[in-house]
UniProtKB/Swiss-Prot annotation:
Boundaries of every G-alpha domain copy: 28-355
Superkingdom in the source lineage: Eukaryota
Name assigned to this protein: Guanine nucleotide-binding protein alpha-12 subunit
Knockout or disruption consequences: Up-regulation of nlp-29 is severely impaired in the hyp7 epidermal cell but not in vulva epidermal cells following fungal infection by D.coniospora or physical injury.
Tagged with keyword RNA-binding: no
Record's subunit section: G proteins are composed of 3 units; alpha, beta and gamma. The alpha chain contains the guanine nucleotide binding site.
Keyword match Magnesium: yes
Coiled-coil parts of chain: none
Amino acid sequence: MVCCFGKKDERTKTIEKELHKERKIMRRQINLLLLGSGESGKSTFVKQMHIIHGAGEFTADEVRAYRQQIYQNAISAMRVLLDARNKLGIAWEDPKRQVEVEKVMRFSVGDLLKGIDFTTFVEVAPIISDFWNDAAIRKTYEQRNLFQISDSCQYFFEHIPRIAMPDFYPTNRDILFCRKATRGISEHIFEINKIPFRFIDVGGQRSQRQKWFQCFTDITSILFMVASNEYDQVILEDRRTNRVVESRSVFETIVNNRAFSNVSIILFMNKNDLLQEKVPKSDIRQYFTDFTGDHTLVRDVQFFLVDKFEASRRDRARPFFYHFTTAVDTENIRRVFRDVRESILEQNLKTLMMQ
């Protein structure tokens, strides 16, 4: 019996030791919640963390899955453009293109969700290239703020010959441009300088936001992503609400929530590359009548948008941090997150000292 108790005591001590070790790790762990409207770049940011602070490369299984998703992205985006061209009444540069339309439009949403294999994709790849090179599709694409289409489609259309090769193996850059809506909650842990950083990525569509409240405990910081180039676009859910207005409304709810009174909230004004392309072509004054700067200057537009979000904060004493980012640019994210990481660790140390 004594021997039995001895073994039991040893097991208890081992369990307690493991629990103590686990609690120590949990106290050091930085929990970052990624929030923002759909298509703001949250999942792309997580991919960058994998590249910069994780394995650096994706596994063979992950790459195979991304390859199928890239095929799906290209077909899906061209279906959207073909439908929009028809609705906008834009005539084909080459009338013969019309006979090819059904070869792309035949794919149903169900087909795309099931996945597109190489054999299927290679049949339509030349047709997609021909469509993309037709002036009618280019004119339609120039009016993309009028309909819902992925920002990454141009990248894939321009790389169709490479993507359609039998030995196509997606690069990290291809994977960064690949789009798949986040459903539910996904968690990713990366050890950075011996400190575990836990990233919680939550779907940004309206239907997914009720799940945000499941993630609100033990949060160190919130990284709130905004697609800054979307000032002339409307959301998918109602096709009326301006996307930046929607993002600001969500940000206002989060930044003024009492649950986050001790949580640092960092604003990422993302898709800066696309904003720079858009500003000379799309006058922000048509969508925000209170804009008073030079509508042709990217910097004026950037700070107008930042001010919109900054003004929604009720607690003016709280520090306000923001960064202009391009989530598909690895060096930009490496540099920005280095700065963000230091400010988060500093704030976390202050919080621990107060406990």
